Each structure stands twice: as C-alpha cells, then as structure tokens.
C-alpha cells in the first residue's frame, strides 16, 4: 500500500521502525524478485523454514498448505531444490459476480483435516506418496495492491516468475480467474511465448473482450493470453462449458483462434472419460509445456457451492480429481491454478475449499507419478481395484456349486 502523504504529524509515527512508511520496493525480475532483499530475511541462510512440529494435527499449528515447510525468498526455493511451491493470490477485485474469492487461499489451506508434513500422505488410488517423492513448500501469498489492478497484476507476474525461474512448479491458489492472465504470462515468460498450453476446466469460456467495460476481468483472461501471444488459441483446451454465455460472436472468435472446446453437452452425450481422453490427446498435440487452470465452478454447485458464478449441471468432484491427476501424470505440468473459491458462499462443511484442496493434492500425486515414470493412461494401483500382485482377485470367495 502506498503511503505518499506526510506522516510527520502522525502521533504513532515514532513507534514504527525507520523506513516503515517508505514506498515498498518494486519487485525485480527473475530471482531478483519478491523476497530477494526482504529485510526480515537478510543474512539468513537460505533454505526451508519449518513453522510446525513434525506430524502436527490438521486443525492445530500454523496453517500452511498441508503443514508444508515455508519458503520466503527465491533463494530458499533454490537452496532446498523445491519441486512444487504452493502460493496464494488473495485477489477478487476483478470479479463481476459474487465476491469473496480473495479469502480463497486461506480457506484452501485451513480446511484440511489430514494433518501435518511428516505424516504419510499415501494415495489409495495409486500407492504414490507425493510428500515422500517431492520437495514441496508453501511460498506464501503474492503482494496485492487493493484498488490498483495494473500494479497487482505486474507483481503477480513477477512473483510467480521467481518461482518458475527457481525450477519449482507453482501451484496457485486464487483469487478470481483474472489472475490467470499474469500467472500464465509469467510461465510463458520463462518457457517461451507459444510454448505453453492450457487445459482450462470451467463453466465459462472467460474469453470476453471486456466485462463490464474493463479489460481486466475474471471473464477475459483467456482472450488476453491469446491476444498477447503468450498462449496461442490452438494451445487451449477447454472442458465443462455450459449455461448462457458467451454469445455467438465470442464463440466465432474462439473458433477463429482454433481453441478446442468441450461443452457439457458433449460430456453428457459421450461420458466424461471419453471427453477427458480427447482433452489429454489435445494437450499433448500442440504445446511443449502444460498449465492447468481449474475454475472450481466447472463442478456442479452440489459439489462446489462456494463460488462466485455457480452454474448448475456441471461435472462431479470425482471427475475433476481424476482429470487433474491424469493430466499431471500422463502429460506433466509446469504450473497449475485453482481459482474462484469463495468461502462466504461455501457450506458449513467447507466442501468447496476441501475440493480445491484435494484437487491440488491430486495434482501433486500426478507430478510425483510423472517423475517416477508412471504415465500409463488412467493408472490405478492393482490393490485399489481389488487385485493382488499377480492380477488375481484379492481374497476372492468362491461360491459353492
């Protein structure tokens, strides 16, 4: 926040450290970005910080994502050789529907009952423990300048750029969907414009030109990514669109950009598994690197009521969890965002935040599977489907004749 006015007459001024009211330093580029010269961390040996005791309970301790250790500077990420960095973007000033997604990152972190880093996080579907396979950290939240969209988006881009430059995969907790514009641009800055593809799960196309009268909106990020050249239209795969927007003119524009779009009508007709197979093939077709953008409203409001623009008739929670894991395992991802979780509209059981939390865990499992070379389509461990090591039914009971 800027404090340009004179504070000499502020009766609290003498209680603050020298320089407290000075304009914050602008974020730098690459590894000279956020945190690189943080006064609180100056002189500290780089590496991960562990704010929780080992195996801390789910609802105790300090609520980092899954009680992960903390990285505060790019140097921490590099020194610890972090594979996955979870970070929040608590921003909803570009939402046009119900507000509250600025509280999304906190809710996604705090809803988890699973317990702490150091406990087993074993996937029953795959028998892969991402927390054992990967070095992961919570990187805190991007800097936000309330009321200043241009500055905030610049800072988001640079903040995420520091993560990508360090070699870690950013998993981004939104926030409204407009943050995908600076976030995916940061990824394209690193890997090259035109080299990144996006699989976009959403009830809405988010390809508007301006909504309402503003270029920066949660209904416009995909158009801006295409128009800038960061992510060409042919590198977009969209899944789950339904409802009453966009209009034909925008759909024609999407076709002109060669976007691949799978509407709920196709999913209902052919089944989610077949459509997901098409999406995986399309994701492998064009781009060298894959970014997943998950708007939680792709799921039916029965599974995700806590969102700004709910649309009935969506996919199930099981559909999205499997889809995210499959893409991360079979294709491999370089970044992911989960956006549009609005805690004020969630139910008492926090099912929307918990679904977002589990989608991230499935992405982590998929990343670990990809690193292990477990990339066969729709892999499930034999034990999870009732088989023993030889492929026979486990503990089978034979009926008497």
Indicate where each model-derived feature is located:
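N-terminal acidic, proline/glycine-rich, low-complexity intrinsically disordered segments
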Residues: 1-7
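Conserved alpha-helical scaffold segments that buttress catalytic/binding sites
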Residues: 3, 13-401
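Intrinsically disordered, low-complexity repeat tracts enriched in Pro/Ser/Thr
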Residues: 8-12
């Amino acid at each position: 926040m800027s404090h340009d006015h004179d504070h000499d007459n502020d009766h609290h001024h003498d209680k603050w450290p020298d320089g407290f009211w000075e304009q914050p330093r602008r974020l730098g580029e690459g590894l000279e970005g956020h945190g690189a010269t943080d006064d609180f961390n100056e002189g500290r040996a780089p590496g991960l910080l562990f704010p929780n005791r080992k195996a801390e309970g789910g609802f105790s301790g300090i609520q980092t994502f899954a009680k992960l250790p903390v990285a505060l500077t790019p140097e921490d990420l590099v020194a610890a050789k972090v594979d996955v960095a979870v970070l929040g973007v608590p921003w909803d000033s570009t939402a046009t529907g119900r507000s509250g997604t600025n509280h999304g990152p906190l809710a996604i972190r705090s809803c988890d009952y699973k317990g702490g880093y150091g406990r087993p996080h074993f996937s029953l579907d795959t028998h892969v423990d991402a927390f054992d396979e990967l070095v992961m950290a919570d990187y805190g939240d991007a800097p936000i300048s309330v009321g200043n969209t241009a500055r905030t988006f610049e800072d988001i881009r640079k903040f995420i750029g520091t993560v990508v430059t360090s070699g870690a995969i950013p998993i981004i907790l939104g926030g409204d969907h407009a943050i995908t514009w600076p976030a995916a641009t940061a990824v394209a800055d690193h890997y090259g414009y035109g080299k990144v593809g996006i699989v976009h799960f959403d009830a809405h196309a988010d390809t508007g030109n301006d909504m309402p009268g503003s270029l920066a909106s949660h209904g416009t990020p995909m158009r801006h990514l295409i128009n800038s050249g960061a992510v060409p239209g042919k590198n977009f795969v969209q899944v789950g669109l339904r409802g009453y927007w966009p209009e034909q003119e925008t759909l024609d524009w999407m076709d002109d950009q060669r976007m691949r779009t799978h509407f709920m009508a196709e999913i209902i007709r052919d089944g989610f598994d077949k459509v997901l197979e098409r999406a995986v093939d399309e994701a492998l077709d064009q781009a060298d690197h894959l970014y997943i953008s998950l708007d939680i409203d792709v799921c039916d409001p029965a599974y995700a009521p806590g969102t700004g623009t709910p649309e009935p008739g969506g996919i199930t929670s099981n559909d999205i969890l499997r889809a995210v894991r499959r893409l991360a395992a079979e294709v491999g991802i370089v970044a992911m965002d989960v956006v549009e979780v609005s805690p004020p509209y969630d139910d008492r059981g926090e099912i929307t935040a918990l679904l977002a939390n589990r989608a991230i865990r499935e992405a982590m499992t998929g990343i670990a599977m990809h690193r292990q070379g477990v990339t066969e389509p729709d892999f499930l461990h034999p034990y999870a489907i009732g088989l023993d090591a030889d492929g026979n039914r486990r503990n089978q009971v034979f009926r008497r004749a």
